[in-house]
Design a protein with these regions (language model features):
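Non-transmembrane, aqueous-exposed alpha-helical and coiled segments at domain scale
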Residues: 1-233
């Protein structure tokens, strides 16, 4: 992957995948709910300041510094991305962006996590939280066929149920795991050690399992809105 493709995948695509699941679980429905601080457009926007700070800081404080290359160029590109995301006339639904999130996370976000750990010797706080949010997003126990004939995991957030769309093996893995246990440590271990997801055993990455399990426990006990508000302080 060349520099410019890496820049796009890690910053533009990675910004979406690392941020939208936490924002969705906290009640947001559109990208503009995250990036716009005031109501804009035709009424779809419900501003979430915590989700906005989470997405902004994960881009500029964790993703950009993790990428090898000219940091000034990367920051400029990131600012262009941030400006583009704020376009109120091009709304993107978070539930649609969430399609196949496990594979997307592996491609777009995991390299930033691992590079950050390699460079700094510690798990990046917000990216670590984003893995926990990914796991929390797949919280259902029942797979059903939706109105379009697609298999989906019926998951829940405070606002109600939603259809989680992914490949059947991913849905079956989470449905079985959630039936088996609610223990954040066990769930984090099972997900991170799934080589089919990550092409490696992420429990072997120093500090990652403990960090993700801790964030997941916070999400479970406090709810995403409070956990997100606390992580961005």
């Amino acid at each position: 992957m060349d520099y410019y493709h890496t820049r796009k995948v890690r910053i533009l695509n990675g910004a979406h995948t690392s941020s939208v699941l936490a924002a969705f679980l906290a009640g947001s429905n559109y990208v503009q709910d995250i990036v716009c601080s005031e109501k804009v457009g035709s009424g779809f926007n419900t501003p979430n300041a915590d989700a906005q700070k989470f997405m902004h800081d994960i881009i500029f404080n964790e993703i950009v510094p993790s990428i090898d290359g000219d940091q000034e160029d990367l920051k400029k590109y990131a600012q262009d991305v941030w400006t583009r995301l704020q376009n109120p006339f091009n709304p993107h639904r978070l539930i649609e962006i969430s399609l196949n999130s496990v594979a997307k996370y592996w491609t777009r976000c995991l390299p930033s996590v691992l590079q950050s750990i390699k460079k700094n010797g510690s798990v990046p706080k917000l990216l670590g939280f984003s893995i926990a949010a990914l796991i929390a997003f797949y919280n259902g126990t029942e797979i059903k066929e939706n109105a379009k004939g697609q298999k989906c995991l019926i998951s829940k957030r405070e606002e109600g149920e939603y259809e989680n769309l992914d490949t059947l093996p991913v849905l079956e893995f989470f449905a079985a795991l959630n039936k088996e246990t609610k223990d954040a440590k066990v769930i984090a271990n099972k997900v991170l050690s799934n080589v089919d997801f990550w092409k490696e055993d992420l429990t072997k990455v120093a500090g990652l399992e403990a960090a993700v399990a801790g964030h997941l426990a916070d999400i479970q006990s406090k709810g995403m809105k409070k956990a997100l508000a606390e992580i961005v302080k």
